[in-house]
Amino acid sequence: MLDKPCGSAACPQCFRLHRLRKLAELAPLRGCMSAYRVVTLVYYDAMLEEEQISCWDHKKFRERVYKMVKRAGFTDKIVGGYELDFHTDIQRWMPHLHLLMPREPGALKTLRKAMKRDKNIRARAGIISRPMKSQKLRDFDAQVTYCFKGMWQEVRPYPDEVGKRRTRKHRLPPVLLARALCKQDEMGFTGLTFTSGVRTRK
Protein backbone atom coordinates (compact mmCIF):
# COMPACT_ATOMS: atom_id res chain seq x y z
CA MET A 1 0.00 0.00 0.00
CA LEU A 2 1.26 3.47 -0.86
CA ASP A 3 2.32 5.77 1.99
CA LYS A 4 -0.13 8.38 0.75
CA PRO A 5 -3.55 7.09 -0.44
CA CYS A 6 -4.42 8.05 -4.02
CA GLY A 7 -8.01 8.83 -3.03
CA SER A 8 -9.59 7.15 -6.05
CA ALA A 9 -12.87 5.27 -5.63
CA ALA A 10 -11.44 2.75 -8.12
CA CYS A 11 -8.59 1.89 -5.75
CA PRO A 12 -9.24 -1.19 -3.55
CA GLN A 13 -7.07 0.14 -0.71
CA CYS A 14 -8.73 3.56 -0.72
CA PHE A 15 -12.19 2.00 -0.91
CA ARG A 16 -11.35 -0.14 2.10
CA LEU A 17 -10.43 3.02 4.02
CA HIS A 18 -13.74 4.54 2.88
CA ARG A 19 -15.67 1.53 4.23
CA LEU A 20 -13.85 1.69 7.56
CA ARG A 21 -14.51 5.41 7.81
CA LYS A 22 -18.22 4.87 7.20
CA LEU A 23 -18.29 2.09 9.78
CA ALA A 24 -16.76 4.47 12.34
CA GLU A 25 -19.20 7.25 11.43
CA LEU A 26 -22.17 4.95 11.94
CA ALA A 27 -20.84 3.35 15.13
CA PRO A 28 -23.32 5.28 17.35
CA LEU A 29 -26.12 3.20 15.78
CA ARG A 30 -24.77 -0.01 17.33
CA GLY A 31 -26.86 0.66 20.39
CA CYS A 32 -30.11 0.81 18.43
CA MET A 33 -29.70 -1.90 15.80
CA SER A 34 -33.32 -2.99 16.14
CA ALA A 35 -34.39 0.44 14.90
CA TYR A 36 -32.73 -0.10 11.50
CA ARG A 37 -33.03 -2.38 8.49
CA VAL A 38 -30.62 -3.22 5.69
CA VAL A 39 -32.52 -2.64 2.46
CA THR A 40 -31.58 -3.41 -1.14
CA LEU A 41 -33.35 -1.44 -3.88
CA VAL A 42 -33.05 -2.68 -7.48
CA TYR A 43 -34.05 -0.39 -10.35
CA TYR A 44 -34.75 -2.77 -13.22
CA ASP A 45 -36.25 0.01 -15.31
CA ALA A 46 -32.94 1.90 -15.18
CA MET A 47 -30.84 -0.88 -16.76
CA LEU A 48 -27.95 0.18 -18.98
CA GLU A 49 -26.53 -1.43 -22.09
CA GLU A 50 -22.91 -2.53 -21.79
CA GLU A 51 -21.39 0.59 -23.34
CA GLN A 52 -23.79 3.05 -21.69
CA ILE A 53 -22.10 2.88 -18.31
CA SER A 54 -19.53 5.51 -19.29
CA CYS A 55 -22.23 8.13 -19.90
CA TRP A 56 -24.59 7.08 -17.08
CA ASP A 57 -26.03 10.17 -15.39
CA HIS A 58 -25.62 9.03 -11.79
CA LYS A 59 -26.63 12.45 -10.45
CA LYS A 60 -30.01 12.22 -12.16
CA PHE A 61 -30.46 8.67 -10.85
CA ARG A 62 -29.51 9.78 -7.33
CA GLU A 63 -32.14 12.52 -7.48
CA ARG A 64 -34.75 9.93 -8.48
CA VAL A 65 -33.89 7.75 -5.49
CA TYR A 66 -33.81 10.73 -3.15
CA LYS A 67 -37.28 11.87 -4.22
CA MET A 68 -38.68 8.34 -3.86
CA VAL A 69 -37.30 8.06 -0.32
CA LYS A 70 -38.66 11.47 0.63
CA ARG A 71 -42.12 10.68 -0.74
CA ALA A 72 -42.16 7.46 1.28
CA GLY A 73 -42.03 9.59 4.41
CA PHE A 74 -38.84 8.49 6.18
CA THR A 75 -37.95 10.78 9.07
CA ASP A 76 -34.56 9.44 10.20
CA LYS A 77 -31.19 9.19 8.48
CA ILE A 78 -30.58 6.86 5.54
CA VAL A 79 -27.13 6.02 4.24
CA GLY A 80 -25.64 3.47 1.86
CA GLY A 81 -24.02 2.93 -1.50
CA TYR A 82 -24.69 2.56 -5.22
CA GLU A 83 -23.63 -0.41 -7.30
CA LEU A 84 -23.97 -1.58 -10.88
CA ASP A 85 -23.68 -5.31 -11.53
CA PHE A 86 -23.55 -6.70 -15.07
CA HIS A 87 -26.16 -9.40 -15.78
CA THR A 88 -24.93 -11.78 -18.47
CA ASP A 89 -28.32 -13.15 -19.54
CA ILE A 90 -29.70 -9.74 -20.54
CA GLN A 91 -26.33 -8.05 -21.17
CA ARG A 92 -27.24 -5.08 -19.01
CA TRP A 93 -25.83 -3.17 -16.06
CA MET A 94 -28.29 -3.17 -13.16
CA PRO A 95 -28.30 -0.11 -10.86
CA HIS A 96 -29.08 -0.91 -7.24
CA LEU A 97 -28.42 0.34 -3.74
CA HIS A 98 -27.65 -1.24 -0.39
CA LEU A 99 -29.00 1.06 2.33
CA LEU A 100 -29.15 1.31 6.08
CA MET A 101 -32.70 2.55 6.66
CA PRO A 102 -34.77 3.31 9.77
CA ARG A 103 -37.36 0.67 10.65
CA GLU A 104 -40.35 2.90 9.96
CA PRO A 105 -43.09 0.44 8.87
CA GLY A 106 -45.32 2.95 7.09
CA ALA A 107 -42.47 4.45 5.09
CA LEU A 108 -41.03 1.04 4.22
CA LYS A 109 -44.44 -0.14 3.00
CA THR A 110 -44.85 2.97 0.85
CA LEU A 111 -41.37 2.55 -0.59
CA ARG A 112 -41.99 -1.11 -1.41
CA LYS A 113 -45.21 -0.18 -3.20
CA ALA A 114 -43.34 2.41 -5.27
CA MET A 115 -40.57 -0.06 -6.12
CA LYS A 116 -43.13 -2.66 -7.28
CA ARG A 117 -44.74 -0.46 -9.92
CA ASP A 118 -45.33 -2.23 -13.23
CA LYS A 119 -42.63 -0.28 -15.07
CA ASN A 120 -39.98 -1.62 -12.70
CA ILE A 121 -41.42 -5.10 -12.13
CA ARG A 122 -41.95 -5.87 -15.83
CA ALA A 123 -38.62 -4.55 -17.11
CA ARG A 124 -37.27 -8.09 -17.65
CA ALA A 125 -39.58 -10.26 -19.74
CA GLY A 126 -40.13 -13.73 -18.32
CA ILE A 127 -38.15 -13.11 -15.14
CA ILE A 128 -39.65 -12.55 -11.70
CA SER A 129 -38.21 -9.31 -10.36
CA ARG A 130 -37.68 -8.58 -6.68
CA PRO A 131 -37.00 -4.84 -6.49
CA MET A 132 -36.80 -4.52 -2.70
CA LYS A 133 -35.26 -6.73 -0.04
CA SER A 134 -35.35 -5.83 3.66
CA GLN A 135 -33.29 -7.59 6.34
CA LYS A 136 -32.86 -7.18 10.08
CA LEU A 137 -29.61 -5.58 11.18
CA ARG A 138 -27.93 -8.45 13.05
CA ASP A 139 -24.19 -8.27 12.28
CA PHE A 140 -23.39 -4.56 12.43
CA ASP A 141 -19.86 -4.60 11.00
CA ALA A 142 -20.56 -7.05 8.17
CA GLN A 143 -23.88 -5.58 7.06
CA VAL A 144 -22.87 -1.93 7.31
CA THR A 145 -19.63 -2.43 5.38
CA TYR A 146 -21.60 -4.44 2.79
CA CYS A 147 -23.57 -1.26 2.09
CA PHE A 148 -20.29 0.28 0.95
CA LYS A 149 -18.51 -2.73 -0.55
CA GLY A 150 -17.71 -0.98 -3.84
CA MET A 151 -17.10 -4.17 -5.81
CA TRP A 152 -19.24 -4.25 -8.94
CA GLN A 153 -19.64 -7.79 -10.23
CA GLU A 154 -20.92 -10.00 -13.01
CA VAL A 155 -24.17 -11.87 -12.29
CA ARG A 156 -24.74 -15.21 -14.03
CA PRO A 157 -28.03 -17.15 -13.81
CA TYR A 158 -28.22 -20.92 -13.41
CA PRO A 159 -30.98 -23.48 -12.67
CA ASP A 160 -30.91 -25.25 -9.32
CA GLU A 161 -31.69 -28.95 -8.81
CA VAL A 162 -35.43 -28.36 -9.25
CA GLY A 163 -35.06 -26.01 -12.20
CA LYS A 164 -35.56 -22.78 -10.27
CA ARG A 165 -33.63 -19.77 -11.53
CA ARG A 166 -30.73 -18.78 -9.30
CA THR A 167 -27.87 -16.35 -9.74
CA ARG A 168 -24.22 -16.36 -8.78
CA LYS A 169 -21.80 -13.44 -8.71
CA HIS A 170 -18.37 -13.47 -10.34
CA ARG A 171 -15.51 -11.06 -10.91
CA LEU A 172 -16.10 -8.84 -13.93
CA PRO A 173 -14.14 -9.77 -17.08
CA PRO A 174 -11.30 -7.33 -17.97
CA VAL A 175 -13.18 -5.03 -20.38
CA LEU A 176 -16.21 -4.65 -18.11
CA LEU A 177 -14.00 -4.27 -15.05
CA ALA A 178 -12.12 -1.44 -16.74
CA ARG A 179 -15.38 0.33 -17.57
CA ALA A 180 -16.66 -0.14 -14.03
CA LEU A 181 -13.47 1.18 -12.45
CA CYS A 182 -13.44 4.22 -14.74
CA LYS A 183 -17.02 5.00 -13.70
CA GLN A 184 -16.24 4.53 -10.01
CA ASP A 185 -13.25 6.84 -10.32
CA GLU A 186 -15.44 9.44 -12.04
CA MET A 187 -18.17 9.23 -9.40
CA GLY A 188 -15.81 9.35 -6.44
CA PHE A 189 -16.72 8.36 -2.90
CA THR A 190 -19.31 11.11 -2.57
CA GLY A 191 -21.03 10.08 -5.81
CA LEU A 192 -21.07 6.42 -4.78
CA THR A 193 -22.68 7.23 -1.42
CA PHE A 194 -26.39 7.86 -0.93
CA THR A 195 -27.48 9.93 2.04
CA SER A 196 -30.78 11.33 3.23
CA GLY A 197 -31.34 13.14 6.50
CA VAL A 198 -27.60 13.26 7.20
CA ARG A 199 -24.87 15.68 6.21
CA THR A 200 -22.80 14.42 3.27
CA ARG A 201 -19.07 14.02 3.87
CA LYS A 202 -16.97 15.50 1.07
Go through the PLM ranges and name each one.
Residues 1-93, 103-202:
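Right-hand nucleic-acid polymerase module
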